[in-house]
Amino acid sequence: MNIFIKALRRYTIMSTPKIVQPKWKVPTPQAKETVLKLYNSLTRSKVEFIPQSGNRGVTWYSCGPTVYDASHMGHARNYVSIDINRRIIQDYFGYDVQFVQNVTDIDDKIILRARQNYLFDNFVKENDTKFNATVVDKVKTALFQYINKNFTIQGSEIKTIEEFETWLSNADTETLKLENPKFPMHVTAVQNAIESITKGDSMDAEVAFEKVKDVTVPLLDKELGSTISNPEIFRQLPAYWEQKFNDDMLSLNVLPPTVTTRVSEYVPEIIDFVQKIIDNGYAYATSDGSVYFDTLKFDKSPNHDYAKCQPWNKGQLDLINDGEGSLSNFADNGKKSNNDFALWKASKAGEPEWESPWGKGRPGWHIECSVMASDILGSNIDIHSGGIDLAFPHHDNELAQSEARFDNQQWINYFLHTGHLHIEGQKMSKSLKNFITIQEALKKFSPRQLRLAFASVQWNNQLDFKESLIHEVKSFENSMNNFFKTIRALKNDAASAGHISKKFSPLEKELLADFVESESKVHSAFCDNLSTPVALKTLSELVTKSNTYITTAGAALKIEPLIAICSYITKILRIIGFPSRPDNLGWAAQAGSNDGSLGSLEDTVMPYVKCLSTFRDDVRSLAIKKAEPKEFLQLTDKIRNEDLLNLNVALDDRNGQSALIKFLTNDEKLEIVKLNEEKHANELAKKQKKLEQQKLREQKENERKQKAQIKPQDMFKDVTLYSAWDEQGLPTKDKDGNDITKSMTKKLKKQWEQQKKLHEEYFGEDK
């Protein structure tokens, strides 16, 4: 039978046609996929971003700070904008970014500033920090040298303060500002020095010295700069400002680099790099021990091009000389062409120096970045970023010397240059001394507001930091704050609302469609050269539509789409660099900011909530075990005298009324704590005294009870004292057989009666 059934099954299977799945249709995208495009300074256009790795890995080098002074708002714009770009590329597009940034701690500006600071400090010390006549004479000499060097004055040199003031009052200052951006800085320096010279006797010496510093240090450096030989002088200044820069970046929530490189730690590699360029035929040494890059030979090479970022600036001597540094010798330097730039500088007296094949010297500015970037990232790098003011000659020289070193055609694939920052229309610069430091800005604006301001303008465009921009930023910030608080409140309400309908009405469907459209717009914005202004505008519009839905839907609103929208907005803001709350329903509150979020509410109320929660737990435990009323009262005393007092809250009990609540200063709290401690100490002392008295009573009672054990008829049975007794045990004769006197008998009788009474008190009457 089993054989028959198996055969039948086999026949059925063989005779049944083979079952196949229906054909699956490949989905056809409704639109072409949007790809990430970046504005590349090497093409001056937006081009598709294609990492050389062919996968998710991206190599990125960014020019870091030259650390000789406080970082200003121009630096903030650059580093925050680059940080935003980096975050979007790695956190939105999902690339694995290896981000390298340098610290320039060997540079003409650093050498000069360190040297001048040292010399000026010594100048002050040598004069016992007194702004005396000797100081005034020196400052006057320095002042007139400064005036005649930095101002173009027709006729003879300025020799008196009156002559300068007369010239300045008649000068066309507006034209002079246009001709020389440093004109206002020089005027301020001179006027400060004149104030100290003329009013120094009535000024604080420290203030007077500080006002003459700018005009005095050039003369001191000219006279004594060459005598500086201690290398520690050139290390202390950059080390100090490097730490300050890092502190500023932390305040602005800028991500730290994957790798940080310092020039001072790369001198051997720089020497090797320069030698390789010489070996490849694109550099030459001069008689003084310097090495220059041969721009003409490089540019004539069929495989190379010079000045790829800004070819129109090729030959601009003012830019070239500025890039060479203020300590460079522009006359008779042995260069083949004025366009050539230093790879290695022969050190002069008063400058730091390192041994090299060409003599004692130090690295040129441009070579530093090439060496450090290549050491970590190799001969071909995906992205290089920095401020637009570095494009020529710095970045163009970087490209040239790196491509000369590796003898390749393209060292960098994408060059991203952030735009200038202007304050109310004026460019900021350390060299112009018209800058607002980051720390000064943070006293007026929160880190969030600064980041919003930078994100509100396309990263490669000029940004004018003015009142109208701040107004827009604060408006956006308030709108987001209100939206986040509303969604969190609605979420809390929904949690206690019980069973509600989940079905989407046309209102929810419309909101969902707006949400999907916004996601698409944000994606397109990020693909379009990381356009944060468009992305932020899209988020703002989505908030407006969500608020409209909340108003229209009323009590029938569905919380799910609102939470999804709020979480999405939070995610995008987090990607741009705004920290978010743990619940992802809004950005995190900022300590010390006045942003409408009232700081961290959780941090503020948590100690009080914990106090209340602990009190509740204790009351509940006592109630469960049916404790005595006094135990509950002890709890109320504890929360009043300890828990709330530790939180600077005092409760004053009042007859027939609720307790009076008082908030205490620390001093007031300490005073109450002191009084409570004294009260507690007094109570302990009383308790101790009571215990001691009780102990004494118990001791006396024990002694009395011990004494009571003796029967009255036995109390005088001491044969050393007495020899005869009556029937009650009272002595009748003393030890010598003499009769007891009447007075003694009376006394003994009294003692006997007392003992009888004591004995009967404890043991009853003897039967």
Curated annotation (Swiss-Prot):
Transmembrane segments: none
Keywords assigned: Aminoacyl-tRNA synthetase, ATP-binding, Ligase, Metal-binding, Nucleotide-binding, Phosphoprotein, Protein biosynthesis, Zinc
Motif extent ('HIGH' region): 65-75
Cofactor: Zn(2+)
Residue ranges, annotated region (Disordered): 683-712
Enzyme Commission numbers on file: 6.1.1.16
GO molecular function: ATP binding; cysteine-tRNA ligase activity; metal ion binding; sequence-specific mRNA binding
Catalysed reactions, semicolon-separated: tRNA(Cys) + L-cysteine + ATP = L-cysteinyl-tRNA(Cys) + AMP + diphosphate
Residue positions binding ATP: 430
EC main group: ligase
Residues holding Zn(2+): 63, 369, 394, 398
InterPro entries, per the entry: Cys-tRNA-ligase, Cys-tRNA/MSH_ligase, Rossmann-like_a/b/a_fold, tRNA-synt_1_cat_dom, tRNAsynth_Ia_anticodon-bd
An example Gene Ontology biological process: cysteinyl-tRNA aminoacylation
Pfam hit, one: tRNA-synt_1e
Motif placement: 'KMSKS' region: 427-431
Compositionally biased region (Basic and acidic residues): 683-706
Cofactor: record remark: Binds 1 zinc ion per subunit.
One GO cellular component term noted in the UniProt record for this chain: mitochondrion
Subunit structure: Homodimer.
Note: Present with 23000 molecules/cell in log phase SD medium.
The protein, known as: Cysteine--tRNA ligase
